[in-house]
Regions:
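Conserved thiamine diphosphate
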Residues: 245
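Signature of exported/secreted
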Residues: 1-238
Length: 283
């Protein structure tokens, strides 16, 4: 884990902290190391990644489902600092894993997309290659400072586990860094000479935020790094994306490919122009 690159932000964080001793952006500047660098967990706990018995192979399922988001508009609550208690084994495991970065990890974000979904990308020789995607966030301030929410664009993960849960060959989860920005920030700020609090926002980039398994059972992680084909991975990731963004079930095409597709299907062109990517907002 490496803290956020302050040069990627639109605000001058250092200047704001110097000008306001009570600024809760101090928490952002001081968060340069994970809460825990390493953690030992029983193998049996990773069986939560196994698909439900009723699952149809290739269909995604929820590990943590967002049932009624706290704030549909994602606004910052003045008195929320710590996450609710975990209620399922999957929540407990993910809470411990992502809690290695910061203890105040919320497994369901304040606004969609939210939660964690998984899908079996490949099943072979009694081993499941599972991809998962998590939308979580961290509240990194502590009283009396006001809340500051750190929301990664997503965590993308992979688990290679025997279908009976007896062997874990590979585990990793990371915030993708292929885009220019990958973290949203929201915090409460006090207006000068007033008791009124306002929400401020920014967006930036964290260069590295990842979890990895150090000593897998059986084969080494390198053995499994290429065990899934590009087509299998692409198909599985597309299904995960559709869990969080149902509109992606409709095929979208770049402008350069639209004319050819329209001719092939003998259909008219419906044009949609957006300011940024649809699937991960501005991230």
């Amino acid at each position: 884990f490496r803290g956020i690159d302050v040069s990627s932000l639109t605000k001058n964080v250092a200047e704001e902290v110097l000008s306001d001793p009570n600024s809760n952006l101090r928490a952002l500047l001081s968060w340069n190391e994970p809460q825990q660098h390493a953690k030992a967990l029983p193998l049996s706990r990773f069986s939560v990644f196994l698909p439900p018995r009723s699952n149809v192979h290739g269909d995604p399922w929820w590990l943590v489902e967002a049932k009624g988001l706290r704030n549909s508009d994602g606004h910052v609550e003045a008195n929320v600092y710590e996450p609710p208690a975990c209620s399922t084994p999957a929540e407990a495991l993910l809470g411990e894993l992502f809690g290695m970065f910061h203890r105040n990890v919320f497994l369901v974000t304040r606004a969609s997309p939210a939660g964690t979904a998984a899908v079996v990308a490949r099943s072979r020789n009694g081993t499941l290659d599972i991809l998962f995607r998590s939308h979580i966030e961290f509240q990194i301030s502590a009283p009396p400072d006001r809340p500051l929410w750190f929301t990664p664009a997503q965590f993308q993960g992979r688990v290679v586990i025997s279908n009976d849960g007896s062997a874990l060959h590979h585990f990793e989860a990371h915030v993708p860094t292929d885009r220019q920005l990958n973290v949203d920030l929201e915090w409460l700020a006090q207006q000068h000479n007033s008791d009124v609090q306002r929400t401020e926002v920014d967006i930036g980039k964290v260069a590295e935020m990842a979890l990895r398994l150090d000593s897998p059972s059986g084969q080494s992680p390198e053995t499994y790094s290429s065990s899934i084909s590009y087509n299998e991975e692409d198909k599985a990731l597309r299904k995960l994306h559709q869990m969080f963004f149902p509109f992606l079930k409709i095929p979208y095409h770049n402008l350069s490919a639209t004319v050819a597709e329209a001719k092939r299907h003998e259909k008219l062109v419906h044009s949609i122009i957006t300011w940024g990517p649809l699937d991960d907002q501005s991230c």
